[in-house]
């Protein structure tokens, strides 16, 4: 008896996603939850109106495969890039400090009356980064192979 192939049988492919509306951004936010990064891995290219972060993203999409294979959950390095950035503001973030590790809780969008708005990165420990944008365009792109999560565990958020 033969068995049909499943999606899990295929090789894992790097994610390359773009959010152009709030619904798309909710997907990116879920994928970025619990991503960690040193404060030194943020960069605003003012002339190109681009803000980017090199994240170490937890691979939420891989949990069923990891559980079934009884292997350690994984992380992957990815770039989160926000386009059309006019202004950057932060709270509770020491920029440029390689020893300060930040953790993403969510990525949301707050539209304004002028047709633009703000992309808000909410960080653990009351930190936040607010990116004023002329339009919503956020990309998430995996840039390395997955690696075993150092903790060996799935992130947990007890109530």
Description of each model-found segment:
Residues 59-61, 86, 94, 113, ...:
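Residues that cap or initiate secondary-structure elements
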């Amino acid at each position: 008896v033969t068995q049909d192939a499943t999606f899990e049988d295929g090789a894992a492919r790097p994610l390359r996603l773009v959010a152009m509306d709030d619904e798309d951004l909710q997907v990116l936010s879920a994928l970025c939850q619990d991503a960690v990064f040193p404060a030194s891995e943020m960069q605003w290219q003012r002339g190109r109106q681009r803000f980017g972060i090199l994240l170490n993203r937890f691979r939420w999409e891989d949990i069923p495969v990891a559980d079934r294979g009884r292997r350690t959950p994984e992380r992957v390095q990815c770039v989160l890039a926000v386009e059309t950035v006019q202004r950057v503001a932060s709270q509770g973030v020491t920029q440029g400090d390689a020893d300060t590790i930040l953790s993403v809780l969510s990525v949301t969008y707050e539209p304004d009356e002028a047709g633009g708005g703000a992309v808000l990165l909410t960080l653990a420990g009351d930190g936040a980064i607010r990116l004023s944008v002329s339009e919503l365009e956020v990309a998430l792109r995996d840039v390395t192979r997955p690696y075993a999560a150092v903790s060996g565990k799935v992130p947990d958020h007890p109530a």
